[in-house]
Every structure is written in structure tokens, then in C-alpha cells.
């Protein structure tokens, strides 16, 4: 027993040391957008501070789960006067000129007219240094969508003028914009002359009819105040209107927040969830209206307990979506404040939990996660303004990104959330097919590293109890109003060690050959990250690469095994040394012994 105790002590020591809280990064500025700017497969953060946008490169190796992540400031470029209010700035990223480098679409809200002035900043290399050049785009009603409308693989700008008429443009190699034919009139069939856009709500680019091809959903406001989702489906000819989603009337729900998109009940169909508010400010959320293709409008319970919610100025975005618990049911995050006096806003994870007593045969409900998050010192002393999910170590386990004010400055930090039990995940990232020098698969990089907006994927597998698990999601379904969707798809596989039976991937492109827009992968090992490249002019076939991420339990087990081996080696060395010492002593005794035979 005494010999076993040291080994048990070492195991506990290693397990404890590997589970210690790592020091999370803390940076100055307001989060503007996410993207992989330097093609190293890590998600970087575009930050606005004092009139300047700065790319903060995340430095962490894909398989190095022991090293804490850190951010290094990179290219900076001034977009306004230093005194500009950060609440007036919005960003979205994409490859607008087809050079496989991330460009930045910036909109600045005019304080008087409430119109957004859009400027495209294109990335270029000059004298081996990255620079960003500005090109004025348009004055629009709110921040525009950054999606590929024309099927050429380049990111286009789709928005609305202040009078409600559509603005749609693509760009050439030099970055200068070219209006598409009649402002997208040939891309959209019988598009209305004007739409009354619902202010503060991001438009969506998601699959609503389960064909894995993303549809465009414009958030509009009817004359009676109803929220109407104008859906446009990609067809062989053009984008065509589809009257799929019935409007939400003020008689039913007079006040609503910005919709979010997820497969809430993990049935293989995407759901649109609209927060139902008690008042126009949306401080109190009572429940969520849920729409899907087969179930139409229903209700999902949302238990906020005694908390009110905090949203940003000029925006109706309340919740942000992510697979936090990795149980195949997406969760949400919200900034909330207790109703009792002298309380500060806090970040809360809304667990997607099973519901057995929900109305109208509902099966899921959202409830505040019981486990409290330990905040860093500055964050706990500051005033929290915004929160979202972020994968700090690129290990498939989502952490919390928190933006707050402290000492008169806007800052953001992170809360590490590594303990997800023995759950597994599948991480999928679909890149654009338009490439330059980054499209030759090398040992450490593949493709353009630019996430394709609207790429959708679904998976199916057998769980540990003999049942089936499935889910569907679309990559970056919204890019305006600081929706801050991460540039990849993350699926929780629960506690099942089984392989993923099938993964279906599709890009928002209509083609006669199914192989041109859809691809399937089978028998995928859990805890994997898959990078997918659709067909392009350079490479006419689908390309994929799989990276396996070891879980924390595996790392701890390997560390314990290594320490035990070291202990055994030390014991062997010690016994060998003692044996040699005894042999030397015996030889000395032999040399001093009197030999009677010699007499």
C-alpha cells in the first residue's frame, strides 16, 4: 500500500495542475468582427479603438492544448477620428476582390441622419507589409449583408438605401465596386421597389427548406408593425421570393427582438427563434417564438428568472448562439442584470434543456445555467456590455468573450470554460473556392482560410444508447448588427465515443450537377476538425483535411503515464546503482581476504 500511495498522489497532482485556471487574455477596444486574417487556422479578432481598426492574431497551435492562447496586435488602419463613439461602428469581413485575403466592410452611423456610411477596406501586400486601402461604397439604412449573391465566389454587399430600395454590388480585382446589372434586378426576380426594413435586426442567410442551400431572409416591418421575414430562394435562374414564414402580428407579439438561428431540438431542421419581449426596449423576455419548415410557428420557453436583459444601442440583438455544452443542442449567451438593487450586469449561458411540461408539445426550453462563471479581476470590477462565444484554444470547447467598460475604457476579456466532462465534438469549416497562392494544400495550410458565408452542413450518428443524433447548422448566418457568429460550425456529439456516420456539406450555389454544390464524408472520428474546400477553377473536386484534437482527459492520462514511467525508470536506475555499489564492495572484500592456498 505504501508503494501505491506515491503513484496516487502523482496522479492527483498532475490532474490538478492540468485543470488549473489559465490566465485569459485581456485587450483594449471593441470587438468588431472575427476571421482568420493570416491563414493559420486560428480565429483572429478585428478590434476598434480610438478611431483605428487593429487585427489581433490569435497564437495557439491546433493540437497544443496545454499552452494558453494569446493575441498579438498586427496590422492597424485608421477609419475615423479618435473621438468617434465606438457604438457607431460596425464591421464585417469577406473576400470582396477575389485575392483570397480578408477585406473589411466598415459602416459608420451618422449621429444626425442615422444613416450608415459604408467603406470597403481591401487588404494588399506592399513592400512585404499588409496595408488596407479604402473604397467608398454607399450610404445605407443599416449595416449591409456581406454574402455571395452572384455565385462567383466573391463576397458582395447587399443592403438597402434609406428609402427602402435595394443596394447590391460586387467588386473587381482593384477593389472598386461595380453595380450588378440594374442593382441586382437580374439576380432577384420581381423584387419589390422598396422594403420597410425592421431597424436593428440582422438579415439572415440560412437554409429554411432542408436542402442545405442557404436562403436570404430580409427582416421587414409591415405597416401594422408585424415582423415579416421576406425569404428568397436560390434557383437555377435567380433568387425568387418564397412565402414560407407567416408574419408575427402585433396582436400576437407586440414587441420582438432580433431572431437567432439554430437546430433547437436537434431534429435536422433549422429553427428561427424570435425573442418575445414585454416592452419595446426588450428588457424582459417572456418566451421565444420558434419557426421551422414542418412545425411552423410554435413557442419555446425561456426562463430568465428574476433577470432583465441588456442589449446594445441601435440593435435588437439579445442572444448569441453556440454549442457550449456539446450535447448536440445549441445554447445561447445573454447579458443579464438582476432586478434587485445595486447589481451589475453579468454574462449568463442559457442552457438548451429538455422540457417535459411545455406548451403545444414543446420539447426544449432555455434556462439560465446554474454554474457561475469566475470572472477575471478587471472584468468583475467593470460594467459588462456584450458577451458571445469564442473558441480560445481552437480545441472545440467554447469559452466566453466578454466586452466591458473599466477605467473609462472599453475592453474585452475571456472566461475559460474547459470543463465539459467527457463530451466530444465535430468542428467543420468551409472555405471559399476562389483562391490565389493559398490554395495549394501544404503541410500546414489548406485553401483560402476565408469562411464561406451561408455554407451549411448536417451530420448524423448513432449515440451510446442505440438511438440517433443529428443536427444542422449554417456558417455565419448573419454578419451585421454585431451578431458575431463564429467563422466555423461546431457540433456537440454528447458523451458518445461513436464515429459520425455521415456529414453532408453544401455551399450556397445552384448547379445541375449535385457534386458541384454538395459533398458527403463518412465515418468521422469524434473530436475532429474538418476543413473543406469546394470545387474551384484550380481544383475541380472537393478537398477536405481532418485534424484530430486530443481531449483534456487524454492529455492528463498521457502525462500520468509519462510520470509513472519516469518513476519506474528512477527506481530501476536506483536499484542498478545499489547493485553496482554492492558488487564493488564485494570485490574490495575479495581483494583484502587472506589466501591460505597461496601459503
Swiss-Prot record:
Membrane-topology descriptor: Single-pass type I membrane protein
GO cellular component, one term: apical plasma membrane
Membrane spanning residue stretches: 554-574
Cellular compartments annotated: Apical cell membrane; Lateral cell membrane
Phenotype when the gene is knocked out: Hermaphrodites are maternal effect lethal and have elongated and strained appearing distal tip cells with abnormal migration. Male animals have detached gonadal cells that do not migrate leading to a partially elongated gonad. RNAi-mediated knockdown results in a mild defective gonad phenotype with 11% of animals having detached gonads and 17% of animals having 'stringy' gonads.
Pfam family, one: C2_ITFG1
Coiled coil: none
Keywords in alphabetical order: Cell adhesion, Cell membrane, Glycoprotein, Membrane, Signal, Transmembrane, Transmembrane helix
Membrane topology (Extracellular): 20-553
Signal peptide: 1-19
Expression (tissue specificity): Expressed in all somatic gonadal cells including distal tip cells, anchor cell, uterine precursor cells and spermatheca precursor cells of the hermaphrodite. Also expressed in the pharynx, pharyngeal-intestinal valve, intestine, excretory cell and canal, seam cells, a subset of hypodermal cells, vulval precursor cells of the hermaphrodite and hook precursor cells in the male.
Any single biological process term in GO: cell adhesion
InterPro entries named in the record: Integrin_alpha_N (IPR028994), Tip (IPR024881)
Family: Belongs to the TIP family.
Primary role: Probable cell adhesion protein involved in gonadal cell migration.
Annotated protein name in UniProt: Protein linkin
Species name: Caenorhabditis elegans
Name of encoding gene: lnkn-1
Amino acid at each position: 500500500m505504501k508503494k501505491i500511495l506515491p503513484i496516487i498522489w502523482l496522479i492527483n497532482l498532475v490532474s490538478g495542475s492540468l485543470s488549473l485556471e489559465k490566465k485569459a487574455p485581456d485587450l483594449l477596444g471593441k470587438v468588431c468582427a472575427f476571421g482568420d486574417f493570416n491563414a493559420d487556422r486560428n480565429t483572429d479578432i478585428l478590434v476598434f479603438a480610438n478611431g483605428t481598426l487593429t487585427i489581433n492574431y490569435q497564437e495557439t497551435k491546433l493540437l497544443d492544448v496545454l499552452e494558453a492562447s494569446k493575441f498579438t496586435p498586427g496590422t492597424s488602419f485608421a477609419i475615423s477620428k479618435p473621438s468617434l463613439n465606438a457604438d457607431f461602428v460596425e464591421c464585417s469581413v469577406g473576400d470582396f476582390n477575389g485575392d483570397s485575403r480578408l477585406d473589411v466592410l466598415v459602416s459608420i452611423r451618422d449621429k444626425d441622419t442615422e444613416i450608415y456610411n459604408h467603406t470597403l477596406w481591401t487588404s494588399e501586400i506592399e513592400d512585404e507589409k499588409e496595408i488596407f486601402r479604402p473604397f467608398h461604397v454607399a450610404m445605407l439604412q443599416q449595416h449591409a449583408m456581406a454574402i455571395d449573391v452572384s455565385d462567383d465566389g466573391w463576397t458582395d454587399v447587399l443592403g438597402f438605401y434609406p428609402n427602402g430600395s435595394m443596394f447590391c454590388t460586387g467588386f473587381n480585382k482593384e477593389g472598386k465596386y461595380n453595380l450588378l446589372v440594374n442593382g441586382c434586378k437580374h439576380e432577384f426576380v420581381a423584387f419589390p421597389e422598396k422594403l420597410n426594413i425592421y431597424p436593428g435586426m440582422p438579415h439572415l442567410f440560412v437554409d429554411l427548406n432542408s436542402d442545405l442551400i442557404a436562403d436570404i431572409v430580409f427582416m421587414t416591418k409591415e405597416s401594422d408593425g408585424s415582423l415579416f421575414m421576406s425569404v428568397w430562394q436560390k434557383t437555377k435562374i435567380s433568387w425568387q421570393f418564397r412565402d414560407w414564414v407567416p408574419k408575427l402580428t402585433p396582436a400576437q407579439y407586440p414587441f420582438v427582438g432580433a431572431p437567432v438561428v439554430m437546430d433547437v431540438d436537434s431534429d435536422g431542421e433549422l429553427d428561427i427563434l424570435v425573442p418575445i419581449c414585454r416592452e419595446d426596449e426588450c428588457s424582459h423576455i417572456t418566451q421565444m417564438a420558434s419557426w421551422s419548415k414542418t412545425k411552423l410557428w410554435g413557442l419555446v420557453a425561456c426562463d430568465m428568472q428574476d433577470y432583465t436583459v441588456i442589449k446594445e444601442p441601435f440593435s435588437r440583438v439579445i442572444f448569441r448562439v453556440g454549442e457550449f455544452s456539446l450535447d448536440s443542442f445549441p445554447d445561447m449567451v445573454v447579458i443579464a442584470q438582476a432586478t434587485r438593487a445595486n447589481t451589475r450586469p453579468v454574462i449568463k449561458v442559457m442552457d438548451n434543456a429538455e422540457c417535459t411540461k411545455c406548451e403545444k408539445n414543446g420539447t426544449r426550453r432555455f434556462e439560465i445555467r446554474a454554474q457561475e462563471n469566475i470572472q477575471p479581476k478587471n472584468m468583475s470590477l467593470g460594467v459588462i456590455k456584450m458577451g458571445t462565444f469564442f473558441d480560445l484554444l481552437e480545441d472545440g470547447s467554447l469559452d466566453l468573450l466578454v466586452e466591458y467598460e473599466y477605467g473609462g475604457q472599453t475592453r474585452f476579456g475571456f472566461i475559460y470554460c474547459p470543463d465539459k466532462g467527457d463530451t466530444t465534438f465535430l468542428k467543420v469549416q468551409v472555405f471559399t473556392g476562389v483562391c490565389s497562392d493559398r490554395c495549394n494544400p501544404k503541410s500546414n495550410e489548406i485553401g483560402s482560410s476565408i469562411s464561406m458565408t451561408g455554407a451549411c452542413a448536417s451530420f448524423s450518428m448513432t449515440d451510446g444508447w442505440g438511438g440517433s443524433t443529428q443536427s444542422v447548422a449554417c456558417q455565419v448566418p448573419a454578419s451585421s448588427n454585431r451578431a458575431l457568429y463564429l467563422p466555423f460550425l461546431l457540433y456537440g456529439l454528447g458523451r458518445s465515443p461513436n464515429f459520425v456516420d455521415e456529414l453532408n456539406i453544401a455551399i450556397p450555389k445552384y448547379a445541375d450537377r449535385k457534386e458541384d454544390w454538395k459533398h458527403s464524408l463518412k465515418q468521422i472520428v469524434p473530436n475532429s476538425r474538418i476543413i473543406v474546400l469546394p470545387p474551384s477553377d484550380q481544383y475541380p473536386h472537393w478537398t477536405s483535411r481532418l485534424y484530430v484534437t486530443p481531449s483534456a482527459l487524454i492529455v492528463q492520462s498521457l502525462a500520468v503515464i509519462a510520470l509513472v514511467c519516469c518513476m519506474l525508470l528512477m527506481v530501476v536506475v536506483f536499484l542498478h546503482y545499489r547493485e553496482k555499489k554492492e558488487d564493488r564492495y564485494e570485490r574490495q572484500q575479495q581483494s583484502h581476504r587472506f589466501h591460505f592456498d597461496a601459503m
